[in-house]
């Protein structure tokens, strides 16, 4: 009887991370409120396009890379340089746990993405952006989303 009670209690304590996949327009509104539109010269369309090609708007996206590092969250931010997972050698330049980049609250992910754009070569950090968004008309990405 005690074992059943303990198991029930443990079941309540386990946190399950449910994948959150945003819509294009919901992200446009979140990104707009976070002042990403024209941040460092990159339009809102750049951010929406990049997030689509990096994670398909999935906050819990993870990609294991050949070098042993992992890309996390909606922006696919790398553990080797930008966030802390479990490895001690990581630089953690965003001063954030990688798990914080995979929540429905995009605050930490947006702050870190801004830091990446500011401290590196803009949005060139993201291969999805370079291949699919750079130099293109991105006005369609926010069309119909009720953002300016």
Curated annotation (Swiss-Prot):
GO MF term list: lysozyme activity
Glycosylation sites: 58
Known EC number: 3.2.1.17
Pfam families hit by this protein: Lys
PROSITE patterns associated with the record: GLYCOSYL_HYDROL_F22_1, GLYCOSYL_HYDROL_F22_2
Keywords: Disulfide bond, Glycoprotein, Glycosidase, Hydrolase, Secreted, Signal
UniProt xrefs under InterPro entries: Glyco_hydro_22, Glyco_hydro_22_CS, Glyco_hydro_22_lys, Lysozyme-like_dom_sf
Enzyme class: hydrolase
Disulfide bonds: 25-145, 49-133, 83-98, 94-112
GO cellular component terms given for this protein: extracellular region
Signal peptide start and end residues: 1-19
Ranges for domain C-type lysozyme: 20-148
Assembly information from the UniProt record: Monomer.
Descriptive protein name: Lysozyme-like protein 1
Originating organism: Bos taurus (Bovine)
Source lineage: Eukaryota, Metazoa, Chordata, Craniata, Vertebrata
